[in-house]
Each structure stands twice: as C-alpha cells, then as structure tokens.
C-alpha cells in the first residue's frame, strides 16, 4: 500500500528552514555514518604527553638524582628532558612507575647548563631520546586505546487530523496535512538538536528504552566559565587559545543568541562570511581568531537556562550515527479511524571523539 509506505525524508527534513538548526544540518549532511546495532562503540588513543612537574614539597638540590613527578609515564630510559625555568638538561636512566619517579644518576646538567636546585611544581619537558652509536632499540612508549560507546535513541513526532480536515478545501494554498508535515519536520529536527546537545546516556533494560549521550556530557576538559561579561581578549585567550590546541583549525561554534550578540560587538574585521557553510544552504559567519576559525551556528536550543551557554565542536571528531534514519511514516492510525496519523521517526546516536578538541562556554552574559 503506497499510502502506508514509510518515506525516507532524511535529506528533506534537513532542508526545512535550515537556519533553524544549522549545526544539526551540517551533522546530518556531512557527518552521517549508519550503525548496525543500538549500542555502538569506537576506540580512541590519546596523544602521548611530554610535560610533567616536580611533585616534592621541599624541591631537590643540585646533586639529587631521583625526582618524584606528577606523571612519570612521559619518560622512558634514554629520554632527554629539560627544566625550562633553569635551562638544565638531564638524561633519564630509569623510571619507577610505582614511586612515580625518574632517576638521572650521572646525567645532571647533561647539556650546556649546569645543575641547579629544583623547586616543587617545576615543569619538565621531554625532548625525546638521544641514543648512542650502535645502540639497541629504546624502550617503547605505548598508549592503549580507550573503548567508548553510546546508544541510539528512538524519537517519534506524530501529527494527524480528521477525515473532514483531509476533505476540506483550505483558505490558504497549503493544505493542512502539508502544513503539518512541514512544521512537524522542523519540530522533529529541533528536538534532535536538543538531544544531541544535552542528552544523557541510558539503557533501560526493563522497558527496552535507550537514550543517547550528547555534547554537553562528553566535554569534560575544556569548560570555561565566563562568569559574566566576556571581552574580546578574554574570548581569544580563554576560549580560542585552549580549544585550538588540539584538532582542526576550523571548528563550529554552536552559539546562543547572547553569545552571537557578544561576538558582534568585537572587532568587525574578525567576522567574515563562512563560504564553507554555503554548500549546506546556510548563511553563516565566521569568527577569525589568532588561533583558528569558528563557524558561528546559532541555536534556538540555547535558551532559558542555556541562554548563556555555547559549545565549540570540532566536526572532524563527531558523527551522526543513525540506526534508522529519519522517515515519514504515513497513515499509522488504526484502520477504522476516520482520519490520518503520520509521524517522523528517527533512531540515532552521537559518536564523539577527542573531547579535548571541543569546549563548553558557560555564563557569558554580556
């Protein structure tokens, strides 16, 4: 029965007034990858660190050769490290993971700078190894990938009317069913954006119900609290500088209307038309900072409590993962009903990688 057939409308729904949810539009059109199960997994590997700090209240004198540090895993035997404050360079002889210490016996002041006393919290930076001629292979540094997961969530938006509504000639050129199809498509997409931003992960085994985790819950490292007024210098220093430390140099700023107003008050030369957004049918601007570009995607979801919140998302590390992409299901009412009942149905989850490359900005009030 063609009237009861489910229609694949994933591309159509992304075109209904695209400026309502620009970030979701970009996700649906460019970052989509289907999943085969309601629970899906991915692996990610963090970059190996190369900074640590001295962790000893009294510090160390210029002859000590074993140091307790915050993170000894940045070193292996044979590595060279530097104390930036003093300029001293040392060579690692051994690493004790149980004691969180490194030993440099015989290799204090190994470069051009003499050994100097170390202070608690002095920074140490690993410069890599310096191997002798005909040396054996150095000890490997291995980082085990982390297994992450999320669930797909079923979302349904229904709409209907009586047989009389179907039969009546409308005063407007658009028939009631067509109007509802369009307006409820927008509602469905707005709800999708809220879930992808604010959702929390849950599998209710008793009721066979799942929820997908959203952006807000994934971001844990870069959370900047503006605490009120945010200047252009503060935005560049405390937002752009850390968020562009990892990942790509062009990211999407899912912005509240208030943050859009704040950015509009900054230097006009920093706001440019985003030509990359044109291919999605979007008319967006970019904020050009010394550290990277932010494509500004205003979001209607960021209102009320979230009116002063915004999210910076590195699009290369997120994916829209549908198990069942958006379909328009016509005539799902019982056969004896004098009328129609249609619905949009989507079952989708969010894949979110390298959370250090994203950021939450909150409490930016002016």
Predicted segment positions?
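Flexible, glycine/threonine- and acidic-rich loop/arm segments that mediate assembly and lattice contacts
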Residues: 1-288, 293, 298-366
